[in-house]
Amino acid sequence: MFGRNSKKDKVTLSEDAYKKARRFFKFLKPYRSVYLVGWLFLILSSITSMLFPALMGQLLGTNGDEKPIVDIPNVDLTNINTILIVMLVVFGAQAVFSFIRIVLFNHVTERALKDLKSKAFDRLIKYPIDFFNRNKVGELSSRIATDINLLQETLNTTIAEFFRQFITIIIALGFILMVSWELALWMLAVVPVLAISAIIFGRYIRKLSKAAQNESASSNAILEEVLTGIVNVKAFTNEQYEINRYGSRIKNILKLNIKSGIMRGAFVSFIIFGMFGGVAFVIWKAKGMQGEGLITSAEFTAFILYTIFLGASFAAVPDLYAKIQKAIGSTEHLMDLLEEDVESAEGNLLTDFKGAVEFKSVSFAFPQRKEIQVLNEISFKCAPGHTTALVGSSGAGKTTISALLLKFYNVDKGAILFDGIDVKDIATESLRSNIAVVPQEVILFGGTVKENILYGKTEATDEEVMEAAKKANAYDFIMSFPDQFDTMVGDRGIQLSGGQKQRVAIARAVLKDPKILILDEATSALDTESEKLVQDALDKLMINRTSFVIAHRLSTIRNADNILVLENGKIVDQGKHDELIAKTDGVYHKLNNMQLS
C-alpha cells in the first residue's frame, strides 16, 4: 500500500509490521507521564475488582467461626454487616479508579491521535504528484479514517481491557494457588494449549483482517469516484455497471469478514470449551476437597467465583488479542504513509525573478509508465512577459509541459531553466509561489467566495480581494448574491456556473500576482458570453507576465508571441499565428481548418 509495498504485503504482516507499530508509541511519548498514571489507576481498579470474589465468598460462605479469607486489621470480616460495608467501600474505590483511568486514557489517546492526524496530513499534502497517481484519493482517505478509528478504540479500550484480563488471571491464579497448588496446576494445564492456539489463530485472523481492510478501502474509492462523477454515471446510464462493480468489492469484503468471523468463532468456541471444561473439572475437584475438610465453605465459594472470573478472562483474551492484531495492521498502514518521501524543500530562492523560461532538450516519461515517452527532445525559450501557446491533439504533451513547469516531476533528460537557473537547483515552494494556474476544471473549496479567492494570497486584505474580483470580471456577479463575498460555495453552498468559477480562479491568480501564468484550456468549456468575459479577464491578467496557454480553440492564441505545435511529444513547428497558418502543409494549418469546418 501507498506505492512501495508489494502485492504480498497487502495480505500479510511481517516482523516489520511490529516494528512500525512500536514506532507509533513515539506519538504517546509527550503524554507518557499521564499515560503511566492512567496505567497505575488501571492496575488499582483491576486489583479492587478482584477483591469482590473474596469478599463475596466470605459473605456467602461464612458461618461466623471460620477464619476470614481476607484479613483487614481492626475489621471483623466474620460479620456480614461489616463485609457489606467493606464491599461498598471497595466498589466505590473501584468506580473512582475506573473513572480516572478512562479520563486519562482518553486524554492521552485523543491527543496522540490528533498529533498522528496532523503528521499524516502534513506528510500527505507534501507528497509529490506521482504519489497521488499511484494511489486513489478515495482509498487513501478511507484508509486513514478507518485505521485511525481502529487505533482510537484500541488505545482507549482494547489494550486496557487486554491487560486488565491478564491482571485478573494473575490474581485469580494467585488465590487458587493459596487455596490449593494442586487445583492451580489443573487450571494452568490448559494455558499452553490456549496460548499456542492464540498464536496460530491470531496470525490467520490478522491476515484476513488486513485483506478485508484493503478491499474496504478499494470499495470506498469506487464509492467516492461514483459520487464525484455522478453526472457522467447517469448521462451514460451506467448505474447498473457501477452497482455491479461496487457489489463485487463488497462481496469480497463479505467473504473475507465471514471467513474471519468463522475463524474467530472457532477460536472462541475452542477457548470456551477448553477453558470452561477445565473450570468445571477444577470446581468438581474443589468440591471434593471441601467435603474432605481441606478448604472452608467461604474459600470454596470464593474459589468458584475466582474460577469463573479466570474462565471469563481466558475467554475474553483471544478476541482482544485479535483486535490488537488488527490495530497493528492499521498502524503498519499509517507508518507506511509516514515513511513515503515528500517533495524536497531544498534549493535556492528565486530573487529578483524576471520570468524567463527555457526548455533544453527535455525528455520525459511518467514514473509509472517509463516505457512510454511523453516528451522527446523539447527545446524552446520564452522571454519575460511573453506568451507561449501550446497546441496539438490530445496526448501530444501540452499538459505535461505545464506539469514540468510546476516541478511536479523531474525531467529524465535535458534541463528546464528559470532565469537561467536549473529547476533542480530552485526550491520548489519558491518556484511555485511565482506561478499561478487557471485550469479548465476549477475546484472550489467548501467556504465563501472570499475564502476561495484568498486561496491565491491568504493574507490579502478585503480591498485587495475586491480589486482582484474586479480585474477578473467577477465583482458584479459576486455582488449580485445576497451575501456577496460571504456567499457559501462548494458542495454545501450556491452552485456557480462554469464561467463564474473560471473568474473566481482568475481572481485567485490576480491576487497571487505571479511572474508566470499557466492557462490550461481555461475557456474551452464555456459558452460564447462567458468565454468573452473570461477571455477579457485573462487578457488583462497576462499583461507583463510570462504566460503559457494550453489552447483548444486556436482563435484564443492569435496574439501569442510564440506558438508551439506538438505532436507525439515533439515540437513539429513553432512561430506566430500568421507564420504557421501560412504553411499550408503544416499541422497548425490543418488544426485551424478542422476547427473552421
Predicted regions and their residues:
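Transmembrane helix-loop-helix hairpins at lipid-water interfaces of multipass membrane proteins
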Residues: 35-97, 177-182, 291-297
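Hydrophobic alpha-helical transmembrane segments of ABC transporter permease domains
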Residues: 40, 48, 97, 145-190, ...
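Helix-loop-helix
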Residues: 175-189, 259-332, 337
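An intracellular "coupling" helix at the cytosolic face of ABC transporter transmembrane type-1 domains
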Residues: 30-33, 129-130, 146-155, 159, ...
